[in-house]
Amino acid sequence: MDGKRNPNGYKDRLLSTRQKIIVVLVAIFLVFVGTIEVLDRLGVYSWEQLYIKFGVIDGVSKTDSNFTVYYINVDQGDCSIIVSGDDVMVIDVATISALNEVRSALKTLEVDKIDYLVLTHPHEDHIGCASTIINEYEVSNILMPKLSSINIPTTSTYEILINDIAKNNINVIQAKPDYNFMIGEAKVEIFAPLQQYEELNNMSIVMKITFGSTKFLFQGDAESEVEQALVESGVDLTADVLKLGHHGSNTSSTNKYLKAVQPKYAIVSCGPDNPYGHPSQKVLDRLNKLNVGVYSTAIHGDITITSDGKNITVLTEKTGWFIWIKIFILLIELNQILQF
């Protein structure tokens, strides 16, 4: 020994300690994964339960719930699927460019018959896949707003749709206030359109679905003029979940309307970095002030909400690595704790 101390000795020991911690964390991680695998195979605890614990799911998937609402990620458009018992209702079917997403969701849910196809209003981003869907699936009823000479569109998409509806001899129901029906054990109430509007957005079907004591409100692209009329009508707009009108645009979701609905959660259906600025920051600010939880298909992907008639559970789509990132973050946090 020359009596000289190694100036890097402490650093070496510290590095060694960190390496040991990393080894321990990796070992814990592997034991964790192995344990879940064993429990999954034994049917005791599954990866699906773990995903649900973290509030994430692998896109659209069937649930054990008697009532489930799926808000499908169709980029800049709308498509929701409601499964209530054995009944299925589809609300809007996006643009034709999202046909694969719509087909995939219906296939995953093993849908071969649609009891009600609701087309809130005849804009391309709501009816784009409608003709294809009614030609490929058994559709019992189509719910549409009654249009007039001041608002009937002249687009080829709409004209082909009308021809295909007639060709398939599908029962068409003209949506109007006070029209109610059941899907499974859920009650559907139509609140609008209230009158004829030149603006097609305001011809949107506004409807509330009630399952037990849980309520879901859909309004297509209905704007502030319709929202104001609904509030003044005195109809019960309260809902646990509000599908924001017009993709979260500032043309909808007024403060007065939001206070009437009193939602716990708001759903935005829009594409990422869309050219319309959806959802509007002003709308998000209003929701934030009212302590409303916001979920967006642009951020969260497919959104699934289940209800047992009393409580609702919100699940969002996971990417293949999402759950592992969460677990990795937990491991990093554990590492930081151990260092102190």
List each model region and its residues.
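Non-globular, low-confidence helical/coil segments that flank catalytic cores
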Residues: 2-340
